[in-house]
């Protein structure tokens, strides 16, 4: 078949035109200075719908858009693409999980064998007495509502007509939401900093941050006041995003209402919803993965209010040294009245270091003379062995290099110690920052709580403690088991990857940590002696056991039905002749007869001997024996009588499950 010349020419013209358009399109799309149509649409949207100016944004009026002031880190001239690394590791771990079962959710643990070097230069803050700091507000911050309730963090006391509503909200949320709902979300707060804090000048080349807030069935106004306070008091050019992680809430106000409300900020505030209840610990790790814009991750509990000029002091140490983790000074927001006051305890300035006792209960101890000598002024950051865990800042990449939280920790408890030990023993530092203050609401008595999901099983917090001490405490773990003997046989899962992490990173021993960083712990909480016996204290051949009934610091113990669940019925008697429950000792009461339980250290209340063969507890000082009344449910001491069955006891081990 013969083709006509005209047909061939027309075909060549069409093909040539198509190729020309392709070349032209490629050249236009490759020009970085010429925004794409989608980019222009986003810019038009930002111009027409600017983010609300909440004050203190550090930018010119009308310019509230996020503008990073520090570039993303480069190593040897190559931008670090962490996201591609995470995707590869996620795919690899998914393959391993399907191949070998869910042995350990260690997606983050295998990503790094070494930490990246510090490549960013940041100048030290400078104290100029009498010269107002460059991040200090020039005028008092505006009230949310002029003259409104709760402004300047003054207490709001409701009348008796609100009693029923207040009690119902405390049961549901842990706070007096009736009062909270009357207070402006943008309320002003009091300034509890030392005067010297106002005269620090910070290099403005600070790292940017993503603020991560995890919530589960939180009250509306306490959650939103947290968000509002961050936006109101954080310079806008450093606030990359606020990431809300909804940990499977079922409250209606946290669904569509929340989704619509955060549109007020045009994408600055984002919400991600877990498909099941993960618990606070793993939800925070999820938050780290979702928060991709800021160079620093700042974690806040869902019921906080940041204070005046909180950001620069908190992030400056991290900008100087990427392996530093910082913690603000945490003030107390009264859950009934919403007054903000300093936390009690600490040294003469109210400063304390984070600590623990050997049963792994969180403690605060005064700042030591050694730590004070390391500072030139009393408002400089200082070292702390541990953090409380709810509020802290850490460089995002460094947190990933550390493996985030141990993926084997469940729901809540122990994660604050795990991340603290990991930071210190593996080359980082943990600093408390006196000039950064954040108020925190503590749950009130009467809260019904948020029970863990069924898939978690029993004793998640105790299992977390066991897992942490098995990974990080080395030979010191024996002291934990002396304090919590019921946990000795508790299954804690696979920790092989965590131990490999320690080995790969040449992490230091717990002995080094106790001698160099946590050297003051044993002065406040001496190493516990070995136990002679432990378990429930049951009346011989009866179904009644000694029960503290949750009382501490002077309450009388009672006799109650044995339940074999430990808790208030779990006691131990040690080689120092102390009969103890956690950090409390049994002793005779003021009447010289009834037995009470009170806080003690290892030098107090060495009063008891247990004669196992005789089924007898003897009070050494008085020579009397431990006795009971099964009718009155009382526990007391009385003259010893070998034939008296109410003086015969047995201690039976109880293992947690």
Curated annotation (Swiss-Prot):
Matching InterPro entries: GalNAc-T, Glyco_trans_2-like, Nucleotide-diphossugar_trans, Ricin_B-like_lectins, Ricin_B_lectin
Catalytic subdomain B: annotated segments: 381-443
Cystine pairs: 197-435, 426-507, 545-562, 585-600, 625-640
Binding site for substrate: 247, 277, 412, 443
Tissue: Highly expressed in sublingual gland. Expressed at lower level in stomach, small intestiine and colon.
Lumenal side: 30-657
Region (Disordered): 30-66
Catalytic activity: L-seryl-[protein] + UDP-N-acetyl-alpha-D-galactosamine = a 3-O-[N-acetyl-alpha-D-galactosaminyl]-L-seryl-[protein] + UDP + H(+); L-threonyl-[protein] + UDP-N-acetyl-alpha-D-galactosamine = a 3-O-[N-acetyl-alpha-D-galactosaminyl]-L-threonyl-[protein] + UDP + H(+)
Keywords noted in UniProt: Disulfide bond, Glycosyltransferase, Golgi apparatus, Lectin, Manganese, Membrane, Metal-binding, Signal-anchor, Transferase, Transmembrane, Transmembrane helix
UniProt remark on domains: There are two conserved domains in the glycosyltransferase region: the N-terminal domain (domain A, also called GT1 motif), which is probably involved in manganese coordination and substrate binding and the C-terminal domain (domain B, also called Gal/GalNAc-T motif), which is probably involved in catalytic reaction and UDP-Gal binding. The ricin B-type lectin domain binds to GalNAc and contributes to the glycopeptide specificity.
PANTHER family referenced in this protein's UniProt entry, alphabetically: N-ACETYLGALACTOSAMINYLTRANSFERASE, N-ACETYLGALACTOSAMINYLTRANSFERASE 7
Name of the protein: N-acetylgalactosaminyltransferase 7
